[in-house]
From Swiss-Prot:
Role: Plays a central role in chromosome cohesion during cell division by preventing premature dissociation of cohesin complex from centromeres after prophase, when most of cohesin complex dissociates from chromosomes arms.
Family annotation (InterPro entries): Shugoshin_N (IPR011516)
Family the UniProt entry places it in: Belongs to the shugoshin family.
Amino acid composition bias (Basic and acidic residues), ranges on this chain: 123-132, 335-352, 379-388
Gene name, Swiss-Prot/TrEMBL: sgo1
Skewed-composition ranges (Acidic residues): 270-286
Domain of life: Eukaryota
GO biological process per UniProt: cell division; chromosome segregation
Stretches for region Disordered: 109-145, 220-247, 263-479
Main location (coarse class): nucleus
Coiled-coil region: 36-76
Ranges of compositional bias, category Polar residues: 290-303, 318-328, 400-411
Protein name: Shugoshin
């Protein structure tokens, strides 16, 4: 241990050691440089190998693609070669047919020289369809096998047109049409029809120009020349009478209903009754009649005449519409008017339809209203609203003689009628309302219309005289 710690004295000098270390370092540096060079060369080799690998892979890909193309082309080439082989065989067969076609004239000429008749014509004649009889209504369709029959060029197919005899018959008779051989008798066969035509014309059936036929019969019957005509039925006397009977009422209606060019089509009851009259109606022993006036107005007038006490019968006051309606009733009509309107009005049968176009306010009746207002002037002035003078003493006394019980059972008192016996006041109240009464109620309750003056009359109740007030006290007013 002590020897290890002891410093040994170097036998060689220090310079020799330095040289030795320097030499060793140089050798180490040389070895390092050589190894680095070798590493660089190896790296370059690796890069070269990688590039070669990439190029080789590219070549492999291209080669595989070429191989696939070659394989596809090989299959295509195989198919082409197969088609080519079959085409060659077909060409050989076609060549054989061409050579056979070239040898056909020689064989045909040889056959003609041997037999003296063309063989194809004989074969076609033997195998061709038989002649079809056109007279047979049902040809042998099974033999034709769905084909149309053969049209022979040398056979005559006649057209069934008018013969000379039929044209002559058409000229002679106006009612008979041209005789048609095709439609005369469906049971006759075509052969019998041809024989019948020959017997009728005295020889074989011949045909004339259709243009001349059309020119001859154009005025009488406009028939096309290429169509057959059917014999017309003779018109019997029964049908002629029926046609005349049908046309007669039409002419009557036309003569009755001739109107102006601009007239409105407003139908009234007279038009409907004339329509019903045109048809012949049987007399069923039923007389239709309307009441002469409304029941309420009739009771009023009867009551007024009873209260009057005088022997003379007064004419009942009627509205214009009621008078116009009553003119149509057979009860109200005068003999002259019945004679003048005899062709319009007829007896309406039971349950026969009646016109509903009978509006009493129809604008078609202004002339009736005008005539009524002109002919019935009751002394009323439109500008003055005063009523007519009250009745005299004799009229009041005559009204007292009437029984109050009978007057109370008639009709109730309304409006301005202060007394049942005031007949003149009733008349004046009825004249004040120039408008027609619609429902047949008392004339004193009818409202004023445009025909009245512009200033409305007062609704104040008129004065009642002393005897009239005594008379009304004895009468019991209805509830």
């Amino acid at each position: 241990m002590a020897r290890l710690n002891e410093s040994t004295a170097s036998s060689e000098p220090i310079e020799i050691l330095k040289r030795r270390f320097v030499r060793q370092n140089r050798e180490i540096a040389r070895v390092n440089s050589i190894q680095s060079l070798r590493i660089r060369s190896l790296e370059s080799e690796v890069s070269n190998l990688l590039s070669e690998n990439v190029s080789l892979r590219e070549q492999i890909i291209t080669l595989t693609q070429e191989l696939e193309r070659f394989e596809a082309a090989r299959t295509l080439h195989d198919g082409v070669y197969d088609v080519k082989a079959r085409l060659d065989s077909k060409l050989v067969e076609l060549g054989n047919l061409i050579t056979e076609l070239g040898s056909l004239p020689r064989r045909y000429s040889r056959a003609v020289r041997e037999n003296g008749e063309p063989a194809p014509a004989r074969q076609s004649r033997e195998s061709g369809p038989k002649e079809v009889d056109d007279t047979d209504p049902e040809p042998n369709l099974g033999f034709l096998d769905g084909r149309l029959p053969v049209i022979m060029e040398d056979k005559l197919y006649p057209r069934r047109t008018l013969t000379a005899q039929e044209v002559q018959e058409l000229r002679d008779s106006d009612t008979d049409g041209p005789n048609c051989s095709g439609f005369e008798d469906s049971s006759i066969s075509p052969k019998q029809r041809v024989e019948y035509d020959e017997a009728a014309t005295g020889g074989p059936a011949y045909f004339i120009d259709t243009n001349t036929i059309v020119e001859e019969i154009e005025n009488e019957h406009s028939l096309p020349p290429n169509l057959e005509t059917r014999r017309k039925k003779k018109i019997g006397p029964a049908t002629v009478n029926k046609d005349q009977a049908d046309t007669r009422p039409i002419s009557l209606l036309d003569s009755k209903f001739t109107r102006k060019c601009g007239a409105k089509r407003k139908f009234s009851a007279e038009d409907d009754e004339s329509l019903f009259e045109s048809s012949p109606s049987e007399d069923d022993e039923f007389q239709f009649s309307r009441p002469a006036q409304s029941p309420k107005l009739f009771s009023q007038n009867e009551h007024a005449s009873a209260d009057d006490g005088s022997g003379e019968l007064r004419r009942p006051i009627q509205s214009p519409t009621l008078s116009s309606q009553n003119d149509h009733s057979p009860v109200k009509m005068k003999p002259q008017s019945e004679r003048s309107i005899a062709h319009v009005h007829g007896e309406r049968r039971v349950l026969e339809p009646k016109s509903t176009n009978t509006n009493i306010l129809s604008p078609a009746k202004p002339s009736i209203m005008k005539d009524y207002n002109q002919n019935h002037d009751f002394g009323y002035n439109e500008k003055s609203e005063k009523p007519l003078p009250r009745q005299g003493k004799g009229a009041v006394d005559g009204s007292k003689n009437a029984s109050p019980k009978k007057s109370s059972t008639r009709t109730p008192v309304f409006g301005n009628d202060g007394n049942k016996s005031g007949n003149k006041q009733k008349k004046s109240g009825a004249i004040k309302s120039n408008t027609p009464s619609l429902d047949g109620i008392e004339d004193s309750e009818i409202a004023t219309t445009a025909d009245m003056p512009s200033t409305r009359p007062s609704r104040r109740r008129g004065t009642v005289s002393q005897p009239e007030s005594h008379k009304t006290e004895g009468i019991s007013m209805p509830p």
